């Protein structure tokens, strides 16, 4: 009889999020990033979207009972992930249901998807309130400028100091660790600037700003990269830094990927693929 396989070295990462048929965002982006960074990726689908690189035309929330069934079947009967990323939760009921599982999950990263790239709100106030509650149970939250403002019920930060203040305020509201993504906020040197805050203080994270319109799924990619790296890094900050470095490279190679006729996806496999496809 063959010996039982040793799975101790296999990092497992779960994404709880919506589906993007174009493959650039949602669970598709999550699983690509996790796989590219050496984790075994798994998924629980919370919503089906009709979207492409040109935009979203529809969202169908998966019934709460079926989301619970997916989670129970995976977690109770088979695999407990080493890390979990949580993304799109379209309704308050979904957010509250997923929140019930947080105490049993390790290394949880919440990407509070609430605002579209256009700046339009994707969730009603009841759902926003449920996501706020979820923020206090996750190990790390990764809102962008607009999402941080929605969580705090104030205007988006217009400066680095404002970004720092909002990160600290999110911590004051109960979030354990916060990474506020600066997005289009211009740093002192035109860098892409994010702010990380935890119990030890605040860190300003800078990376070169890449000039490209192909940025579909950047938030999904970053949060799932952090989750997949955290089990193999000594600290959350180290995982965040390495994930940000990976994302910068993925954005930098996005134009070479050349997929779609709108805002194309980043290149999740830029470290693996070659021009010959080997």
Tell where the protein language model's regions lie, with residue ranges.
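Short pre-catalytic strand/loop immediately N-terminal to key active-site residues, enriched for Gly-Thr
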Residues: 16-22, 202-216
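Phosphate-handling active-site elements
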Residues: 37-42, 203, 229-243
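Acidic-glycine-rich active-site phosphate/pyrophosphate-binding loop
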Residues: 2-10, 26, 189-205
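Charged C-terminal helix
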Residues: 10, 58-61, 77, 237-278
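Conserved N-terminal subdomain of the carbohydrate kinase-like
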Residues: 2-15, 31-117
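Short, small-residue alpha-helix embedded
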Residues: 33, 149-150, 213-236
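Short beta-strands and strand-loop turn motifs
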Residues: 15, 81-83, 109-116, 142-151, ...
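Conserved phosphate/ATP/ADP-binding segment of small-molecule kinases
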Residues: 125-202
């Amino acid at each position: 009889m063959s010996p039982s396989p040793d799975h101790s070295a296999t990092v497992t990462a779960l994404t709880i999020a919506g589906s993007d048929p174009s493959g650039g965002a949602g669970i598709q982006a999550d699983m690509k990033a996790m796989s590219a960074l050496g984790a075994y990726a798994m998924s629980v689908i919370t919503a089906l979207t009709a979207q492409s690189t040109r935009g979203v035309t529809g969202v169908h929330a998966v019934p709460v009972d079926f989301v619970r069934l997916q989670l129970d079947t995976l977690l109770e009967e088979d695999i407990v992930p080493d890390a979990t990323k949580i993304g799109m939760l379209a309704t308050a009921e979904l957010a509250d249901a997923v929140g019930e599982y947080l105490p049993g999950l390790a290394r949880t990263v919440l990407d509070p998807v609430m605002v579209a790239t256009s700046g339009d709100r994707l969730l009603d106030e009841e759902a926003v309130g449920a996501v706020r509650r979820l923020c206090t149970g996750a190990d790390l939250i990764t809102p962008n400028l607009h999402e941080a403002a929605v969580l705090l019920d104030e205007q988006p930060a217009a400066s680095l100091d404002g970004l720092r203040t909002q990160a600290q305020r999110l911590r004051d509201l109960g979030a354990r660790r916060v990474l506020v993504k600066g997005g289009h906020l211009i740093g002192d040197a035109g860098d892409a600037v994010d702010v990380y805050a935890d119990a030890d203080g605040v860190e300003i994270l800078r990376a070169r700003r890449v000039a490209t319109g192909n940025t579909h799924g950047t938030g999904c990619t970053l949060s799932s990269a952090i989750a997949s790296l955290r089990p193999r890094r000594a600290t959350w900050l180290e995982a965040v830094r390495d994930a940000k470095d990976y994302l910068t490279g993925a954005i930098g190679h996005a134009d070479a990927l050349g997929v779609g006729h709108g805002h194309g996806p980043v290149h999740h496999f830029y470290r693996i693929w070659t021009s010959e496809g080997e």
